[in-house]
Amino acid sequence: MLDGSLGFCIVAIVEERDGLPVCVAEDHLYDRPLLQRITNLIPSPVERTMLTEVVVGTGPGSYSGVRIAASAAVGIAAGLALPLRESASDQALWQAAQRSFSIPLGTRESLEVLESGALVVPRETASLHLSQEESRGVAACALARAAGPAVAHITLRYPAPARGSEGQ
């Protein structure tokens, strides 16, 4: 499970037990490089063969974070010949948090995540961000639970058109 929408990357191993996703391992070393964090969770070739799929959060959220996590997920899925599933980050994370929260989208804006959906707001009016501590254990399971069927290509979700593209 990989998701970079929050501005820090969630890296976790999730198993299904009695029909429910359970986070069995999660790397909380957010200041470490992403590939190092991934290999910390699955260090040996034997452990890698126990993986059955790769799930990635597709945003909306941190522009760079979503793209980095998606790139890593595609590489892992291709390298290990595993199915790739995508999960709408805002919807899954709202289910995990059970409250409104915001995701920083640079220095001026945030993505306000509400039960009814997500919208871009000025950063100064945004609600509290979902913290790293709040996300532990629950975010990965929520993303896994909300994942769709296997896909050949990831479709990243953006909250608004890119700046300057309005007239095109």
Regions from the PLM with identified roles:
Residues 2-8, 15-16, 52-55, 72-77:
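Long, contiguous secondary-structure blocks with strong helical propensity
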Residues 1-36, 85-168:
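Oxyanion-binding and handling regions
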Residues 38, 72-77, 142-144:
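Buried hydrophobic packing segments
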Residues 18-21, 42-44, 73-76, 120-121:
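Short, low-complexity, polar/charged sequence segments that are solvent-exposed and flexible
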Residues 53-58, 63-83:
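DPxDG-like acidic metal-binding loop motif
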Residues 38-53:
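Phosphate/pyrophosphate-binding loops at sites that engage ATP/ADP/AMP, CoA/4′-phosphopantetheine
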Residues 28, 32-35, 48, 66-70:
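Generic alpha-helical scaffold signal
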